[in-house]
Structure formats: structure tokens, C-alpha cells
Design a protein with these regions (language model features):
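Aromatic-lined, polymer-binding surfaces characteristic
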Residues: 277-278, 332-338, 356-361, 368, ...
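Terminal accessory carbohydrate-recognition/targeting modules of carbohydrate-active enzymes
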Residues: 19-241, 276-278, 283, 292-299, ...
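Extended ligand-binding clefts on enzyme/binding-domain cores
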Residues: 312-349, 355, 423-431, 448-546
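Solvent-exposed loop and edge beta-strand segments that line ligand/cofactor-binding
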Residues: 46-48, 210-220, 224, 230-234, ...
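Helix-terminus loop motifs that line ligand-binding clefts
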Residues: 91-93, 259-270, 295-375, 379-400, ...
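Bacterial Sec-dependent N-terminal signal peptides
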Residues: 1-22
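Well-ordered alpha-helical scaffold segments within catalytic/enzyme domains
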Residues: 225-234, 247-251, 285-298, 363-380, ...
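Extended, well-ordered alpha-helical scaffold segments
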Residues: 202-224, 237-244, 295-313, 323, ...
Length: 637
């Protein structure tokens, strides 16, 4: 009996190993079929499965203010033909979406070179092949856009209705020899945009132009690539993902030509159709760091100045129904959550009150200090020093509680005030931000000691209250049981990734503990956000994978970092070089309870197989930016 049992176990293990080997060798397949174009003013989404532009919007942000959403000005733009494209892709990793047909290409873009609120479609081919081609579209104020099945604003119900009055036009022009370009233009008027001649003027300009606008747009983005630092050691796939990430970062930043002056420079957490096309401080801070690392200094500076100028400070005091004041209690400049499209601070509400997130202070401090350190922009530092001291760094210090941790807030996962906690992530990023700011203050011969001391206080508070068994860190000070929802928290790894704690032995023991409970099953590493039956929390989070990879690099574990980083690269390579919020995991999906399955209409994360792109796509700060920061660290000498 014992021999039979042993043989059965060995056979089972062999079969599992064989299956795992087969799965490991299985090539990745595309799982995301939408592409986005934006010029920081307008944004449009191409649906490759349906061969159409789902919709085009007059702004890249979700809400003007607390009471008004942004609606599309046109929907379902389709080529008036039964022919389907052979291939769809971003043209040379730019913002131009190209659909290749047998005898012509169709190119979709918002124009950076023109900087206008016109959506352009350019058919390119021989005259006889394109002269009779045209498009049909859903237009008209109040008309519902058909075919949209997922929310594009988590507070906005379906269906989505068109707003504004459509303006259209077309023109044919010779490109070279017998090749022509046929331009189709879509714009609008509304209460904020009243230029009824915008399309006719653009058509006249196209007709007279000596260059192709399509070529001008591609050249614009390629020039941006050349302005960035892209190490020659990158693989071809890595270079493609980095270039596309540069385009995404550029597309996600509001243009200086946006009609709302306080919105200039704000960076979306995602592009449409991803749900999070809102300027979060957290995501924006990582995006700014990535811009700085790339050499996109002008864009990084604009991102910082947007937050330094934005109207804010509205939650200095916030008394919740439990009678506690969750505000910082002092004047502050950086939003406690995110920003409306008009540039004002927004702390989004639900039945449990607003989100109030003090980690934003620390993350902004880090992004600010990183920019100044890498650019040596002393004039910028001096210009904003008073605001940075009094309304950012001092505001952070004021949030340190009596136990040497940042006071309770909504946390990095935004649970509002339902269960406020003192989070490891929050204290960790605030400690690191103050630490870096103190060093810069000292470098500029300015007062620094209180920031240095505050950083040391927070670090000691983390070691005292968050370190368990001298081996690993829990997610917050409040939860005592390992079964608690946020006891184990993927955000914990930020204290290693940002360089606050550089104890390799402690990192490895923390890794060992979290591998038991937060790592997905299978041959490759991958990590969930929280132990949960909610699919938005229990799937594999790309941002967490990348921050763990960054922590591995700081600990000298380059091979372990590569396992996480390479999978992101390989996935992006088959999905137009974009990066999602999450990857699906079937075993984790089986843990999702029925009451959470309806969440799919907003979270886009219910799938029946592994390794699918899910959640918000494309992610900017938590996607493209986090990838760039990790990849560049990997190739650092």
C-alpha cells in the first residue's frame, strides 16, 4: 500500500510538472483589442474587434467638476466598407493608430503639431483605391452611443450620450506620385468651444500644406523619442514598450491649450477607455518620476507645477460621522486624492465619506526631489521652496501621530473612511519623501533638521509597529490577525522599492512570508493586492509586480527582478506595447464570490482564464511609468 501510494504521488507530481512545463512554453496571446489616441486635448478609442472608433471626447479627463461629466462628441465612426483590416497597431510606437488593409491604410490620431480639438482620420493609398471610401458615425446631441458595455466613468451610468454639435469635413491631397491621402475631420462646438469654422480652416490648411500631417505627427513623436534617454542595451521588445510608454505619458498629460487654465500639466492615471482617466496625485507622482528619468524634463516640470498651482486645501478639517477630524489640520497644497478636469482638488465620496490620502504628500515630495536632483534646476527649487516647506513638507510632518506613524486615513487602496487605518505604505512614502526633501534642503543650505528628524521618526515607527516577528511587515498598525482583510498588503513592498529600508535580510524574509499568501500559483512569480473575494483586489497587480521587482534590484537580486519585469515586457509585446492594471488569474478568480461579479461593469476584471489584460487599460503612472522606472533601474550600472 505504501509503495502504491508513493508511486501515485510521484505520478501526480510528474503530471503536474509536465502540465506546468507545457503551460510555461505556451506563447502569450493578445487579450486587449483597443487603442487610444490623444493630444492632451481630445481623446478617441479605436476598437480593433469591431473595426471602429468607439467614441471621441472633447477632453481627456473624466469630469469638469463635481457635477458634470465629459461626454463624447461623436460615436461609432466606421469605414463604409465590408473589408476588414489585416492588422491594427500603433504606428512606430507613436500616438497614431493604423489599420492596414490590402490596398490602403487608415490612420487615426489627435494632432500634437496642430494642437487643435479635431480628430483626424487619414486614408492613404492609390487614388483609385481610396477616392470612394467614406465613414459613417453616430452624431447628434443626446444620442446614445451604441455598443458600449463597460462604464467609462465609475459614477456615470450607461448608456453614454453624445454632447455638443458635430462639425465634419474631408479633403483629398496627393502624397507622392500615385499615392494620395484622404483626410476626414471631426470636431465640435459646445458651450466652451464656439468656433464653427475650425474644420473649414483646417481643411484649407491641409490643402495648401507642403507636408503630410500624418508624417508630421509621426515625426513629432519620433523627435520626442530622440529627446529621451533610451539605453542601447535594451532589447528590441523593451525599446518598443518604452517608446510606446513615452507616447502614452505624453498623451496622458493635459495640453497647455486646454480651455481650463488650472488643468494644464495634469496627468491622467489612465487613458480612455480605462476607467481612471482622472489626475490622481499618486499615479501622477510616479508618472513625473518616469518623465524625469526619461529626460522629459519639460513635461515633468509641468506635472509638478500643475499640483503646486492647483486650487486645493478644501479638506483641512473633515469631521466624519465618528466625530473624528480626518483632515491634516493645517494648510496644504497637494490634493488629498486627485483633481477635477478644471484643476481643483477632488476627494471623491461614497456612503463612507471622502477618500483622504496622506501618502500623496510623500509621493509628491519624492517626485519633486527626484526632478530637482536629476536636473539641477535650482531656480525651480528656490521658486517653490516656500510652498514646498510650508504646505507640503510641514503638512506631512503635522500628520505624524503620537505613535510615530502618519495618522489614520483612507489608505493607498482608497477605502474612504469606512475603516481608516495607519498604513505601512503611507508612512513609508512620507518618510522617504521627507528624507529626500531634508537632503535637498541641506544641499541648498536651507533649514533641514526637522524634515530629517521627521523621516527618522516615521521610519522608527514603522519598525516598531509594523514589523512582525522581526521578519516581515504587515499592511497597517490596526489589524492584528493574519486573517484580517489588509493584514497582508502588496503595498508594503514600497518601503523597500523606494529605498527607505535597505536591509537585504529583512527584505528576503518579508518576501518569504508574502510568497506564502500573496504570490499567485504557478511557475512564474506574480502578486495580488490583498487577500480578498473581490476581483479588483485578488487578481495579479502589475504595479505591485513592478515595485517588487524594483525592491529586488535594490537588494541585488537581479535575476528575481528579471522574472517579474520580463513577463510584463512579453505581455506588452503582444498587446500593442501597452500595460494594464492587472492580469487575470483563474485560481484567484475561483475565489470571487457572487456578490462581487457584478463589479465587472466597472472593474473589467472577470475572466475565465489566466494572463488576460484586465482592469483599467492603458495604465499610466501604475503602468507605463512604473515599468520605465523598474527597467531603467535594471540597466543601471
Amino acid at each position: 500500500m505504501k509503495i502504491r501510494y508513493i508511486l501515485a504521488v510521484l505520478l501526480s507530481l510528474f503530471c503536474q510538472s509536465l502540465l506546468s512545463a507545457q503551460e510555461a512554453g505556451k506563447p502569450l496571446e493578445p487579450s486587449y483589442f483597443k487603442l487610444t489616441t490623444s493630444n492632451g486635448l481630445i481623446v478617441a478609442v479605436y476598437n480593433a474587434k469591431e473595426n471602429r472608433i468607439d467614441d471621441a471626447y472633447p477632453h481627456i479627463f473624466a469630469n469638469y467638476d463635481s457635477g458634470q461629466y465629459v461626454y463624447p462628441f461623436v460615436g461609432n465612426i466606421r469605414l463604409n466598407s465590408t473589408e476588414r483590416p489585416e492588422k491594427t497597431y500603433y504606428l512606430k510606437n507613436t500616438h497614431i493608430i493604423t489599420a492596414s488593409y490590402k490596398d490602403f491604410t487608415v490612420n487615426y490620431f489627435s494632432s500634437f503639431t496642430r494642437g487643435d480639438i479635431i480628430f483626424y482620420i487619414v486614408i492613404k493609398g492609390k487614388k483609385q483605391n481610396i477616392k470612394d471610401l467614406s465613414f459613417i458615425a453616430e452624431t447628434g446631441k443626446g444620442k446614445a452611443v451604441s455598443g458600449i458595455t463597460l462604464l467609462e466613468n465609475h459614477l456615470q451610468d450607461l448608456p453614454i450620450h453624445i454632447a455638443g454639435n458635430i462639425l465634419t469635413g474631408s479633403v483629398m491631397r496627393r502624397y507622392a506620385n500615385d499615392v494620395y491621402e484622404k483626410y476626414f475631420l471631426y470636431s465640435f462646438t459646445d458651450s466652451l468651444h464656439t468656433d464653427t469654422a475650425i474644420v473649414s480652416r483646417a481643411i484649407a490648411r491641409l490643402a495648401k500644406s507642403k507636408t503630410s500631417l500624418l508624417d508630421d505627427e509621426a515625426r513629432y513623436m519620433k523627435n520626442l523619442f530622440s529627446r529621451c534617454t533610451i539605453p542601447p542595451a535594451f532589447s528590441a521588445k523593451e525599446k518598443n514598450v518604452v517608446e510606446q510608454s513615452i507616447s502614452i505619458l505624453k498623451m496622458a498629460q493635459v495640453s497647455d491649450k486646454e480651455i481650463f487654465p488650472f488643468s494644464h500639466g495634469q496627468i491622467m492615471a489612465s487613458l480612455r477607455p480605462g476607467l481612471w482617466h482622472v489626475a490622481w496625485v499618486r499615479d501622477g507622482s510616479y508618472a513625473i518620476q518616469a518623465m524625469t528619468r526619461l529626460g522629459m524634463y519639460a513635461e515633468a516640470k509641468k506635472g509638478l507645477e500643475f499640483m503646486l498651482k492647483a486650487p486645493s486645501g478644501y479638506f483641512k478639517h473633515y469631521i466624519y460621522k465618528d466625530g473624528k477630524d480626518y483632515g491634516p489640520g493645517v494648510d496644504y497644497q497637494i490634493s488629498l486624492t486627485r483633481y477635477f478636469g478644471n484643476g481643483k482638488e477632488e476627494c471623491d465620496y461614497n456612503e463612507f465619506g471622502p477618500n483622504i490620502e496622506f501618502d500623496d504628500f510623500g509621493l509628491f515630495l519624492t517626485a519633486f526631489c527626484d526632478y530637482v536632483s536629476r536636473t539641477n534646476d535650482s531656480a525651480f527649487y528656490k521658486k517653490w521652496n516656500q510652498v514646498m516647506c510650508t504646505k507640503v513638507a510641514d503638512a506631512t510632518v503635522s500628520c505624524i501621530d503620537t505613535n510615530s506613524l502618519i495618522k489614520a486615513d483612507s489608505g493607498p487602496w482608497e477605502h474612504h473612511l469606512e475603516m481608516p487605518r495607519q498604513y505601512t505604505f503611507t508612512s513609508g512614502v512620507c518618510a522617504r519623501g521627507l528624507e529626500q526633501f531634508g537632503k535637498l534642503q541641506r544641499q541648498f543650505h536651507l533649514p533641514y533638521k526637522k524634515y530629517k528628524l521627521a523621516a527618522e521618526t516615521l521610519k522608527q515607527g514603522i519598525m516598531t509597529h509594523m514589523l512582525c516577528d522581526n521578519r516581515y511587515f504587515k499592511g497597517n498598525v490596526n489589524d492584528q490577525l493574519k486573517t484580517a482583510h489588509e493584514y497582508y498588503d502588496g503595498g508594503v513592498f514600497e518601503i523597500f522599492a523606494n529605498g527607505l529600508i535597505r536591509d537585504k535580510k529583512l527584505f528576503l524574509s518579508n518576501m518569504e512570508e508574502y510568497d506564502k499568501v500573496m504570490r499567485i500559483k504557478g511557475n512564474r512569480p506574480g502578486y495580488i493586492r490583498l487577500i480578498s473575494a473581490d476581483p479588483y483586489e485578488n487578481q495579479e497587480w502589475v504595479f505591485i509586480n513592478l515595485r517588487i521587482a524594483q525592491a529586488h534590484l535594490l537588494a541585488g537580486n537581479k535575476p528575481d527582478a528579471a522574472k517579474l519585469l520580463d513577463f510584463v515586457t512579453e505581455q506588452a509585446a503582444v498587446n500593442n506595447n501597452t500595460i494594464p492594471e492587472m492580469y487575470s488569474n483563474k485560481l484567484q478568480m475561483d475565489k470571487v464570490t457572487d456578490n462581487f461579479r457584478s463589479n465587472n461593469i466597472w472593474c473589467n476584471c472577470i475572466r475565465d482564464k489566466d494572463d488576460q489584460y484586465i482592469g483599467t487599460i492603458p495604465m499610466v503612472g501604475y503602468g507605463s511609468a512604473a515599468y520605465i522606472l523598474t527597467l531603467y533601474s535594471y540597466y543601471d550600472k
